[in-house]
Amino acid sequence: MESSGNLSYNKGVKSDKNWVIEESRFSRRELKKIEAIFAQGNGYLGQRAALEEVYSTETRGLYLAGLYDRFGEEEVTELPNLADFCNIRIFLDDEEFRMVQGKTVLYSRRLNLKDGVITRHVCWEGRNGVEAEFFFERFVSLADKHVIASRVRIMPYHRNVKVKIISGINGRMTNNGTQHFHEVEARMHKEKMMEYISDAQAKQ
């Protein structure tokens, strides 16, 4: 199968031939499906491929192999959804980058099955007239099973732009409304590193 809807399965060339899946058009209705198809993992951590910006139709998920929890006696035992740290809010001249507003001129998201890296390339024009190009990369490390890394590059066109980025750790993630963890401690180290410690509610 070479393509299905807005997905293509034959985008790789040369040594990457038949290794690359591409989503060529953004669709809010298909977010959950693409998050599952593009999911990344290393045998210890597994993550759904939710985008950096938040959408109402998404399902964010980070899971740890072998970790199970039951919220109460009447609930089923399940893989608890861990804290999310991939949400990045980006503002250009005070307008937030979201593909459901403004104009998305170009969109491509790819998963290379050979190295496990997800890349996303977006050309976007805000309602305030700002035009910019975005490059996103994310991978789950095999070398260090505790590492998930992401990189964002922003290239405004034509003029100087004030860029504001807001990121953090959301420890209030749920499994369809069931929150398995409660916050124990959250703090910043030298304004460069955020530490978040949580504890399970739980009954195994």
Regions found by a protein language model. Name each.
Residues 5-204:
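Beta-sandwich/jelly-roll carbohydrate-recognition scaffolds of carbohydrate-active enzymes
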